[in-house]
Amino acid sequence: MKREVIHAPGVPAPLAHYCQGVVAGDTIYAAGQIASDYRTSVPAEARVDPAFPYYGSEIQRQTRYILENIRKTFQAAGADLADVVKAQVFLTDLADFFHFDQVWKEFFPSPPPRTTVQISGLLVPGCRVEIDLVGVRRHVKREVIRADGVPAPLAHYCQGVIVGDTIYAAGQIASDYRTGVPAEARVDPAFPYYGSDIQRQTRYILENIRRTFRAAGADLADVVKAQVFLTDLTDFFHFDQVWKEFFPSPPPRTTVQVSGLLVPGCRVEIDLIGVGRHVKREVIRADGVPAPLAHYCQGVVAGDTIYAAGQIASNYRTGVPAEARVDPAFPYYGSDIERQTRYILENVRKTFQAAGADLADVVKAQVFLTDLRDFFYFDQVWKEFFPSPPPRTTVQVSGLLVPGCRVEIDLVAVRG
């Protein structure tokens, strides 16, 4: 499939090793953007004048700055923000959300599906939000999904969109948007030892997302990519038991801990991508890649698109293996983050090669670091594996599923 790197005039050039965006076929994958010009940190037009602190909103200025830049990126690809079909929003403080959403409405009169979580840090101090968008060219047919029985969101987004053969669903949490977490998604406080909040919430969410997929002429068996945002990783094992009920043949999955979700009491947000039932897909089984302990697969090929599971530096036998960590007897002779990044990318490369592709075919990358101070050293290894880098989103999260792991990498590729 034909790929083209986007070079949009007027958009700040990144300091790190990634590109503004890639067009693969008719799909536009944009890099996550923050409100920085990469010269002066947060530029004057994206912040409130400290001499007049009550005459403006930082989050609104930053959101507007970002969306104006992303619009230029999409326009350079022959599209516009009206062509966005999936959005992910990473806020450093959920108290900013309401004011963020007011600006979102200005740019998206007909909004795309969206996932919003709170993360613990962004790469430029003072930045309050990172926005990650996927779109399509203007001529591509799309249809908004309206599923009966699924709670209508309070905020400005839709349940999902069908774009050609792909189904993009909004991230869902266990809320009816009337009472917070509804009774059926929580344990009765009078009987606290007779149930599991995370299992009830997971079941509530997946039943709703199943309705969304069925309204699109598909089902959960047609999911080809999952991202799971937990507020507490100690919930993971019990979450995964419910996941097995809904996904006998599981999709690739990325799981990270975030620091907050938009409704108090919600413990998990689930973000899914699917394809139409007629689309040929194949589960990837790559030799030499550690078999996961949990219920997901290494990756799926759907049409020409390859969705890989998020990977961390674990062999799932000994935690972080020796080759992915510095010998504690020689702590100053190596870098944990560089070793972990190399370990992960070598494994992901095997996954892509088993699917008839390579890292040169990656069109979208998301990087979840547990400590942003690792970023510079991470990026040095990234350059080795990606001489011509894909668009990338990088955020700091609160935790990963194996203690000692410092980064999770989530990649999507398109076969050439």
Where are these regions (language model features)?
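N-terminal presequence-like segments and the immediate start of the first folded domain
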Residues: 1-68, 72-85, 90-207, 211-225, ...
